[in-house]
């Protein structure tokens, strides 16, 4: 019987890598959930996406700008720069059309836009203007620069930092307090408020609540800095911003599409735990046909189940208090890391045929692992940084793009071992006289290749498109599809490679082992006179104790 050879330096490399990432997990501090705080200094971006949140009726958002200033370098020609905020409302997570226009397009200079409310700042005059679209009717909430009794019943009393400057603003504010948070299409659409200014730094607070069913939707808050024409890159004005955002639905700090997620994660964790328990029962029942890879496969559903449980706990605390408990968040990050690394390692090991059709990883196989494991580590690091970083920071977009690219490379890399095994079996079926067995293995490997492609397609492409296609309150269907596709992939992989004597993948021929061990045997003088003994079936002629040792 061929004895599995330790992975040596490759295994120690993996161990060091996992220790390093575990240390990184402990150093990461989770972001404050749905109670956001963002500090930007000397930023020159034209547009900053502050946040996106799905609101139900009676939900609200409070935006507290504690300091905002514009810094103009010496000799700057960007004297007529405009700054302000925009509140965009959509029915799903699709892209806002007005944000995808020309790079020099400035939304703050538009007099009227459907489904967009503008908050335009005049720092020199200590004035803020609120421009609401007249054609929106009752579809948008009213932005208010004064305390609101309805919001006070659900949150801490916001400080009064601005006063209406005209009678129209007072009438609108009174109407808002009466529960009529809508935009009258016949009213004046622009209102002005005074704001506090000290040494060129302004501070103010505004908020809104969703008072009708028609106002429900996905709201995105942006900060804009519109430069003047013909401004050179080195002469652009920069801004410094310190802002806190609190958003809440009636009974949860979670966005409308995230409210069902804690229950969903707990339910899926039970399914993964049940599938892992069934798999353990199968391994114990067919002990003679079990390999080490089978036990590695057994660890996967339990790790996935733990990750989902901790994720549900994390979301539960965010839902109830607006931010996670740091300890639970770190535990979730660690289990998420282990699950991701274990998943890709297991897929790659099955694809190479390790412990099934060969007991030694070739140099080509080891190179795949030297690529896949660091990529998977980098993908997990990117995911953790994204979860721990505010959306408006400069590095958020970089890490988000990096996560997408690295995850795509990971998915492509794990397909190579399967393709190589298919080619190897195609050549073997035509040369070694055992066409029936090799063709059965070949058919199974092709099925496994299709299975991996479908898994990647559903979890990376279909689920991603679903997130942008469904209404905002059904955004959780994206996670449901992702977790369901993962569960189906686990079950089908276990069924295809289950420990059974009639499984074509496990019907090994001694010649397959000889091909891998040929160089070792021919260079050993001690084994010069040894004869080959043909093996009838996988595990049928070996004593039970020997198989237990390799499993």
Swiss-Prot record:
One of its GO terms (cellular component) is clathrin-coated vesicle. It is found in: Cell membrane; Golgi apparatus, trans-Golgi network membrane. The keyword Nucleotidyltransferase does not apply. PANTHER family: LUNG SEVEN TRANSMEMBRANE RECEPTOR (PTHR21229), PROTEIN GPR107 (PTHR21229:SF12). The chain crosses the membrane at residues 263-283, 293-313, 337-357, 368-388, 402-422, 450-470, 476-495. Keywords: Cell membrane, Disulfide bond, Glycoprotein, Golgi apparatus, Membrane, Phosphoprotein, Signal, Transmembrane, Transmembrane helix. Cleaved by FURIN to yield two fragments that remain associated via a disulfide bond. Disulfide bonds join 106-226. The modification Phosphoserine is found at residue 537. GO terms for molecular function: clathrin heavy chain binding. It comes from Mus musculus (Mouse). Residues 1-33 form the signal peptide. This is Protein GPR107. InterPro entries: CAND6-7_N, GOST_TM, GPR107/GPR108-like. It is a multi-pass membrane protein. Residues 284-292, 358-367, 423-449, 496-551 are cytoplasmic. Belongs to the LU7TM family. Has been proposed to act as a receptor for neuronostatin, a peptide derived from the somatostatin/SST precursor. Involved in blood sugar regulation through the induction of glucagon in response to low glucose. Glycans are attached at residues 64, 209. The keyword Glycoprotein applies. It comes from the Eukaryota. Residues 40-262, 314-336, 389-401, 471-475 are extracellular. One of its GO terms (biological process) is clathrin-dependent endocytosis.
